[in-house]
Curated annotation (Swiss-Prot):
Annotated protein name in UniProt: Ferric-chelate reductase 1
Tissue expression pattern: Expressed in spleen, liver and kidney with low expression in brain. Localizes in adult brain to the choroid plexus of the fourth, third, and lateral ventricles and to ependymal cells that line the ventricles.
Annotated binding of heme b 2, by residue: 414, 482
Record key words, sorted: Electron transport, Glycoprotein, Heme, Iron, Membrane, Metal-binding, Oxidoreductase, Transmembrane, Transmembrane helix, Transport
Organism: Mus musculus
Cellular component GO terms held in the UniProt record: membrane
Upregulation: Down-regulated in kidney and liver of mice lacking hypotransferrinemic (hpx), which have iron overload of the liver and pancreas.
């Protein structure tokens, strides 16, 4: 596996839509030769559509009406070939009858050699004219590829042969007959899987650890039970599209032996596949699987199958008596076509041999580096910076006469917390680059906001080292600059945290993460508002009487004492609440 595991991205990122070659607009000139859609599925064997022609003989220059018809289909590709050399290039050109549903294609730099659809709407009939070239082969056969769904299509459906008047009789080439293969049977599961024998007879991968799919629909469950020279596999997970797992030599995606259970309407298609990097999985024959069964209930997809431990004839199937990392992913699908999953796959912490001693293991959906990045940023921008700001803004008078290392205590506390914030940010900033090996292009605005926060976090302590003396005229400018940079950093950091929680590399539980972050913001703003109101009311208690220009301060000492106690209580309560919110996020990170 050569490509780094996506953080967002995937086991079966394999399941990336961006890599799927599907053309709803019908512009498929690259398919002119083989006429095979690049859908990574096997074509159907028995055609249910037909091609008819308006005449069975032709001369060069004739225009023949060709009709493709049958049950509703969404896409098609129509060509004329030399009937005695169907693998040869397209012959002649086409003229459109309905330009809303069909269009001419350019093949081998010649316009009009083929016709395809213009849109993916359902259609039951397409009519075009074929213009016979001069010179022309003695016999012509039309071929059509028809797409009903993404994974249901027919390739090179033949038409009756049309011939020139004086041509020798057409002889159908002898076809090499192949024995018909009966597709493997698929049954319906009557009850959900159970985790009862996990660790005894079954090797199980579960998330949350020790969950039971029989009792918990949200349980991600994968089990392997050895039976002589085969392994029975059970897979279950909440999804409306597909669930999948893969065996991998490392924790990066690519070159993996994967298996998908894809929902199609009210059935499930069980499909072995092979992952090559971040591209769409290459679907393989189901002939390697036996005893296939599936079940749909309560938003959960469950499927099972049996596979031999060794498959010498199957190129991309791994032997199962070796150790691998195990991936589990789920995501959306439509008409049998799978799409990129929104969160990282579950990946076991180490390699396991599923045919060895039965165990019950778990995994993680996030890299330890990304977990550390998120945890450090939460500590820095939820806790240390927030407490540091409150101390500097509201507690100067409380600890103005207390000193620590020859500086006011409030200032030393503020400075230590802010230095801690900058150091935590610097360490956390590096971790995603180490994990990704560079810039993360799929992370949206989060990395840009993160770079901005990093810049401000470094700039802020540098500005503080040039702080002018207390009575210096430049002190006012410094104060405003210092406040502006700090406030901007905090606002951008909160925005970055909101976005980062949704990235595939972390993807904390929804909607709890949003409520928790909103709760933290309200908690902090509410605390600042309370302290501001208190400061205003305290100033109102100090009555200034102007009598012969002599100021008399009434009860100043008592008011200040009362104010200091109140502020300390508010700070203690705030820190407790802050730590609770921080613990919620750190716990969520630990459990993904």
């Amino acid at each position: 596996m050569a490509a780094p595991q996506i953080t967002l991205s995937v086991l079966v990122i394999a399941l990336l839509t961006c890599s799927v070659t599907a053309y709803p607009n019908g512009k498929v000139p690259m398919s002119c030769g083989g006429m095979i859609p690049q859908h990574n599925h096997s074509p159907q064997s028995e055609p249910i559509h037909q091609i008819t022609v308006s005449q069975t003989t032709f001369k060069p220059g004739d225009q023949i009406e060709v009709t493709l018809s049958g049950p509703p289909f969404r896409g098609f590709l129509l060509e004329a070939r030399d009937a005695e050399n169907l693998s040869g290039p397209p012959i002649g050109s086409f003229t459109l009858i309905d330009s809303e549903e069909s269009q001419l294609l350019t093949c081998t730099d010649v316009q009009g050699l083929a016709v395809s659809h213009t849109r993916s709407s359902k259609k039951t009939e397409i009519k075009v004219y074929w213009d016979a070239p001069s010179p022309a082969p003695d016999h012509i056969r039309f071929l059509a590829t028809v797409v009903q769904k993404f994974k249901i299509y027919w390739v090179k459906i033949p038409s009756p042969v049309i011939s020139q008047p004086n041509a020798p009789p057409f002889t159908t080439p002898k076809a090499t007959t192949q024995p018909l293969t009966t597709p493997p049977s698929v049954s319906h599961l009557t009850k959900p899987f159970s985790a009862f024998e996990c660790g005894n007879k079954k090797f199980c991968v579960r998330s949350p650890l020790n969950c039971d799919p029989e009792k918990e629909p949200a349980c991600v469950f994968l089990s392997f039970t050895r039976d002589n020279q085969s392994v029975m596999v059970e897979m279950s997970g909440p999804s409306d599209g597909y669930v999948s797992f893969a065996f991998s030599h490392d924790q990066w995606m690519g070159d993996d032996d994967a298996y998908l259970c894809i929902r199609e309407d009210q059935t499930v298609d069980i499909q072995p596949s092979y992952l090559t990097g971040r591209s769409y999985p290459v679907m393989d024959s189901r002939g390697t699987l036996e005893d296939m069964a599936w079940r749909l209930a309560d938003g959960v997809i469950q499927c099972s199958f049996r596979r031999n431990i060794t498959l010498p004839e199957a190129k991309n199937r791994f032997v199962l008596n070796e150790s691998y990392y195990i991936f589990f992913a789920e995501g959306p699908s439509h008409d049998g076509r799978i799409f990129r999953h929104s969160q990282q796959p579950l990946i076991t912490y180490e390699k396991y041999n599923v045919t060895d001693t039965p165990k019950s293991v778990g995994g993680s959906r996030s890299s330890p580096l990304l977990k550390a990045h998120g945890a450090l940023m939460f500590v820095a921008w939820m806790t240390t910076v927030s407490i540091g700001v409150l101390v500097a803004r509201f507690f100067r008078s409380v600890w103005s006469k207390a000193f620590f290392l020859r500086e006011a205590a409030w200032f030393q506390v503020h400075r230590m917390l802010m230095v801690a914030t900058s150091l935590l940010t610097c360490v956390a900033f590096v971790l995603p680059f180490v994990y990704r090996g560079g810039w993360s292009w799929r992370a949206g605005y989060h990395p840009y906001l993160g770079c901005t926060v990093m810049t401000l976090a470094v700039l802020q302590p540098l500005l503080a080292t040039f702080r002018p003396p207390l009575h210096d005229p430049r002190r006012q400018v410094f104060n405003w600059t210092h406040w502006s940079v700090g406030t901007a950093a905090r606002i951008i950091a909160v925005a970055a945290m909101f976005l980062g929680m949704d990235l595939p590399g972390l993807n904390l539980p929804s909607p709890q993460k949003t409520y928790a972050m909103m709760g933290f913001v309200v908690w902090h703003i509410g605390t600042e508002v309370i302290l501001e109101i208190h400061a205003y009311r305290l100033s109102r208690k100090v009555e200034i009487l102007d009598n012969d220009r002599i100021q008399i301060l009434q009860s100043l000492t008592v008011a200040e004492a009362e104010g200091h106690v109140f502020k300390k209580v508010v700070l203690a309560v705030y820190i407790c609440g802050n730590v609770i919110f921080l613990s919620i996020f750190l716990s969520a990170i630990n459990h993904i």
